[in-house]
Amino acid sequence: MKITKVAVAGTLESSDVQVRVQPFDSLDIEINSSVAKQFGEQIEATVREVLAKLGITAAQVIVEDKGALDCVLQARVKAAAMRATDEMINWEAVL
């Protein structure tokens, strides 16, 4: 999947995460979280895993974490990535 435009998913509410995805020449992940020292590596690993499953190798991803669970982070990354592409989505494969 190729990222062609800027897209955002999520909110800045407590227990949520806002993920911004935009075109970039390589894969760049920025994590802003009050729990980054404890969970920063896990957050980055989750983001990388979701992007790999979607076939994304070039994008800038900015994660503003407010204490979201892993499943919420996965959903937000997936939603932002799908909003940021012009490709047709195979919904049977995604769901």
Swiss-Prot record:
Belongs to the CitD family. Transmembrane segments: none annotated. The keyword Plastid does not apply. The gene is citD. Covalent carrier of the coenzyme of citrate lyase. It comes from the Bacteria. It comes from Haemophilus influenzae (strain PittGG). GO terms for cellular component: cytoplasm. Keywords: Cytoplasm, Phosphoprotein. The keyword Iron-sulfur does not apply. The modification O-(phosphoribosyl dephospho-coenzyme A)serine is found at residue 14. InterPro entries: CitD (IPR006495), Mal_deCO2ase/Cit_lyase_ACP (IPR023439). Its main location: cytoplasm. It is found in: Cytoplasm. Oligomer with a subunit composition of (alpha,beta,gamma)6. This is Citrate lyase acyl carrier protein. The lineage of its organism: Bacteria, Pseudomonadati, Pseudomonadota, Gammaproteobacteria, Pasteurellales.
